[in-house]
Amino acid sequence: LVSIGFILLNLYFVVKKDSLIVNALPVLLGVFLLALFSFDKLIWFVAFFAPLSLPLSEIIPSFSFDMYLPTEPLLFGILILFLLKVIHERKFDRDILLHPVSMAIYINLIWIFLTSLTSTMPVVSFKFLLARMWFVVCLYLLTAKIFKSGKKMEQYVWLYLIAFIVVVFYATYRHWGYGLFNKQAAHYVVSPFYNDHTSYGAAVAIYLPFSVLFAFSKVYSWKFRRVALVVLGILVMAFVLSY
């Protein structure tokens, strides 16, 4: 019955509304179930899709607002679910909540809130505060809890790297068409995944040390280090071509 209902609803939206939006429902349901039973799996999902996210303006240019899909809606959803979970369970890791870094972040958030009240563009300011909050919850509070296991930190890095290498090949292929020594081309070949070569180069620089560690640390097997060495070579190439 559920399947028949989904098919009929999908047909209605395709025929009457010329829209495929109903096809997103199974994905949304899957994400909701992931969040319900395992926050860390949802964080892995965000880590993998972060480099591959596309701005909404690239898909629907007529929209008056912009966001990166699918990561920013996911981060917002994680924020809401996290707050509901904390309210329901009335607990979270106190070591993380009361850490000096956490305290500094709280002061920053309070300051943003106070300045948003007196802002000449309050809507923009509160949107910025909301975005800051979902980044803090997902990429600080939850990851700090998950990363208590070193192995999970490695998984997070590798998920990002695998997706990021796809972007590197895409950017390099486009750059090749303009000439690899064309510095001006480096500004736009990374679009639409990155705004310009600066943010792209910064992402490469952040993950280069991890690749060096994976490639040369004897903690890892020789097979693993060979794969990491290839990844390191790709990132070095990307760093050079990012100009």
What are the residue ranges of the model-derived segments?
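Transmembrane signal-anchor hairpin modules in multi-pass inner-membrane enzymes, especially those
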Residues: L1-F113, V124, K148-W158, F214-V227
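Alpha-helical transmembrane segments of multi-pass inner-membrane proteins
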Residues: V2-N10, V27-F32, L79, I105-L117, ...
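Membrane-interface micro-motifs in multi-pass membrane enzymes
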Residues: D18-I21, S64-L74, F128-R132, F193-Y207
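Hydrophobic alpha-helical transmembrane segments of multi-pass membrane proteins
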Residues: F32, F126-L130, T143
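Transmembrane alpha-helical core residues of multi-pass small-molecule transporters
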Residues: F49-A50, A131, A163
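Juxtamembrane membrane-water interface segments that cap and precede transmembrane helices
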Residues: L54-F63, T118, F181-F193
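Alpha-helical transmembrane segments and their immediate interhelical/interface regions
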Residues: T120-V136
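Transmembrane alpha-helical segments of multipass membrane enzymes and assembly factors
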Residues: L142-K151, L241
